Amino acid sequence: MEDCNVHSAASILASVKEQEARFERLTRALEQERRHVALQLERAQQPGMSSGGMVGSGQPLPMAWQQLVLQEQSPGSQASLATMPEAPEVLEETVTVEEDPGTPTSHVSIVTSEDGTTRRTETKVTKTVKTVTTRTVRQVPLGPDGLPLLDGGPPLGSFADGPLDRHYLLRGGGGPAATLSRTYHSSGGGFPDGPESRDIPSYGSLSRGLGVRPPRTGLLGPGPGDGCFTLPGRREAFPMGSESGPPSGRSLPEHFQAEPYGLEDDTRSLAADDEGGPDLEPDYSTATRRRPEYGRGLRARAFEDTADDAGELIEERPPFPAATAPLAQPERGSLGSLDRVVRRSPSVDSTRKEPRWRDPELPEVLAMLRHPVDPVKANAAAYLQHLCFENEGIKRRVRQLRGLPLLVALLDHPRAEVRRRACGALRNLSYGRDTDNKAAIRDCGGVPALVRLLRAARDNEVRELVTGTLWNLSSYEPLKMVIIDHGLQTLTHEVIVPHSGWEREPNEDSKPRDAEWTTVFKNTSGCLRNVSSDGAEARRRLRECEGLVDALLHALQSAVGRKDTDNKSVENCVCIMRNLSYHVHKEVPGADRYQEAEPGIPGSTTSQRRRKDDASCFGGKKAKEEWFHQGKKDAEMDRNFDTLDLPKRTEAAKGFELLYQPEVVRLYLSLLTESRNFNTLEAAAGALQNLSAGNWTWATYIRATVRKERGLPVLVELLQSETDKVVRAVAIALRNLSLDQRNKDLIGSYAMTELVRNVRNAQAPAHPSAHLEEDTVVAVLNTIHEIVSDSLDNARSLLQARGVPALVALVASSQSVREAKAASHVLQTVWSYKELRGALQRDGWTKSRFQSASTAKGPKGTPSSGGFDDSTLPLVDKSLDGEKSNTRDVIPMDTLGPDGYATVDRRERRTLGSDSTGDTSEKELLRPDPGRKAPPPGPSRPSVRLVDAVGDTKPQPVDSWV
């Protein structure tokens, strides 16, 4: 086999050598013919000059030269020329090796070895053809500048090429080395980038020639620099230094670099074949544009980011800044550039240099929304979205020019691209503190149109835009019920239920699906969070919406299971649950069946009994002690705190019933344990506060369940948080939970120190970030008042925690009437216990101090009338919804601020006229306050055990604090 291979290789080598020898002979023959042609041309020059430029045949000299040039370009035609004497010349050869297009010869050999294996060898022989082209170049005299004399020399000039650019040669242009061109193609393609492009070297194969300029073609065909040979007489058609270009009077189009257009950038384009319809150049200027090439149409993507991720709006700026900036977050314009890569509008810098370009005026853009061509409408809407980005002035003018109805009408357009871009513009226009745009969108039917688009859209980007727009609109109070009326069912069944992972009829064999934290889900949950704060009717509609509560709880359970509790979607879901839990003991169907007897006013009966015992001359103290010990003993015996007698259910709870089931306590405690999102912590504590309020059976179960699930340590731990709203929500929740006597004892024993510490921070915070707002201080004082009422042990705990000095100092120094009034009530309650007066007097406190504390300041700073009252009365402030202010079924939340109830995000309840920080849906994503510390991570916070007591073989005591 090896001999066969060697033989084949040798035969191939011999064949190649034979071909080379043949080519060499052919080359010599061609060189000889070249010499003959050169001599003939030299002889033809002399008679032509003497006979007025005519050759022997009578042809004009330029025509004869042109024929000679054409003959020289065609190898094989030179043999017809006469032999002429030789003359001095410079020979130039160009050899080009090409493969024979014929089928290569293949030799196949098969060898079978001794072991039975077969080996197949195939050898291919490819025939190559070598073409040698030779040309003769005369010596050209040089001028004083060292360059060839192009016009003063012989008529041939530079035989190798057309006229050379003297300026180009003086610059030292190396030029390319190229072979003689045999074919020329006239092209109407694009123009070169500029004169500097000819400095780029290119190399022909095996070339040994002079430096010449690269071939150049244009709209008018080949020019003098295109590699053809042009006689001096023909140079008039190609002026010296001229280049191919468009006709005179028309300038070359600029070549713009891809750059961001404003603050937004977009790299996606819309292909004309994707959308159909005419190809449109998005040119909004009045000048005529030329483009070298027609490419694909453009699609600018509407960014999906929603408005709630925004911080405060920056100051107004021109719509087209000269400098670029990173992608903005709050509301993104959809148009990165009106024209990218192939077709684009001029950049800002080029616009300033080129006066014929200008930006379209806003009325022109709005007029394009009525254009009959769909791509014009789409690009106009995208451009409008870009203009509205963080520009309140443009948004206001769009409304004044009646642009909002045009955009709303485009939401029902048959083409998806038009709908998408119109929705993106509406999202930006609906963002901001100015509610006039939101009202205008409502007046022209924007909410129903958005809901229709959400039902019909299957493109995720369109769904993000629709839900983001609805989120912006939901922050406007008059629009909340409109969104509920038109979009509640669609938002629930199209987004919340599918993305939450909840299934109406789950398959027992399959694993439950996890929630999908998509942008669409985040936007929709944010919208429902806003509308759930509208009022009782809105809460009723959301509670009765089939699948909504089930899906939200399933999503929260999924977040806890995956330990992903800090995202915005979880925050929105918890806030919705908190809002729907508000007044649940009054508003849910059948709540009357679970109502319990109204408890007496705190301290009313017992205070009268104590006053009666105190008035007696004998046995007052003994009677007091007997009453206290007997009452405490009875309280412990009346209820077995180790067991909970929950109502029997024949079927699983669903819908709004899930809101107040004891099982939901475990979910909220898990969120309080795992989450580091302050908004989520506040909402979870607020939900427990709502569920533990009221005088009905389920509130009793909730209070006991919190203790059973060891939730009290979790709440007390959060009192150390330096986030004001978290401390406030936890303090109110502890007050409601203390309505359970056993909870009150535990809270008084273990939480009093933290409560007093917050009172001290109200006067002299340890650091600026620890300062508490008035609402939070009042909430803490209300909780202290609740746990010391009817509990001597808790009052002793207050003394041991050095709470009396803090309360007295607060009354004396506070500028808030509400704070001083709340602190006075606590001091009044403490002084009512005779058992503590001795200790107080030993510490230097007198009765006058407590009297002055309770009577020093009344409403608006006026002295209170009446003498000292040692009865423990609750704080009296503004009532809520006509309820008595001294009732204990609900905490008088008006004492916490202008809101009325803390179940709803207070920012959502503010009127936009007084809210200087923007709407809830337009808040910045939660970021840790650099001045506040997060709750201590790790084991410093007690963990919540989510294990049923039934499954524990040796359960710990229910009242265990650790």
UniProtKB/Swiss-Prot annotation:
Alphabetic keyword roster: Cell adhesion, Cell junction, Coiled coil, Cytoplasm, Methylation, mRNA processing, mRNA splicing, Nucleus, Phosphoprotein, Repeat
Modification Phosphothreonine occurs at: T103, T105, T643, T872
Residues that span the membrane, as ranges: none
GO cellular component, one term: adherens junction
Biased composition (Acidic residues): 272-282
Region named Disordered: 95-123, 233-255, 268-291, 322-357, 593-618, 844-962
Positions with biased composition (Basic and acidic residues): 878-887, 920-932
GO molecular function, one term: cadherin binding
Entries under SMART domains matching the protein: ARM
SUPFAM superfamilies tied to this protein: ARM repeat (SSF48371)
Positions carrying Omega-N-methylarginine: R171
Chain intervals with Polar residues compositional bias: 103-115
Motif (Nuclear localization signal): 608-624
Region annotation Required for interaction with RNA-binding proteins DDX5, HNRNPH2 and SRSF1 and with mRNAs: where it falls in the sequence: 777-962
Sites bearing Phosphoserine, chain numbering: S269, S334, S337, S345, S347, S607, S864, S871
Ranges in a coiled coil: 11-46
A single GO BP: calcium-dependent cell-cell adhesion via plasma membrane cell adhesion molecules
Keyword Signal: no
Family assignment from sequence similarity: Belongs to the beta-catenin family.
Quaternary structure note: Component of a ribonucleoprotein complex containing mRNAs and RNA-binding proteins including DDX5, HNRNPH2 and SRSF1 as well as ARVCF. Interacts (via the extreme C-terminus) with FRMPD2 (via the PDZ 2 domain). Interacts with CCDC85B.
Biological role stated in the UniProt entry: Contributes to the regulation of alternative splicing of pre-mRNAs.
Name of protein: Splicing regulator ARVCF
Protein species of origin: Mus musculus (Mouse)
Taxonomic lineage from the root: Eukaryota, Metazoa, Chordata, Craniata, Vertebrata
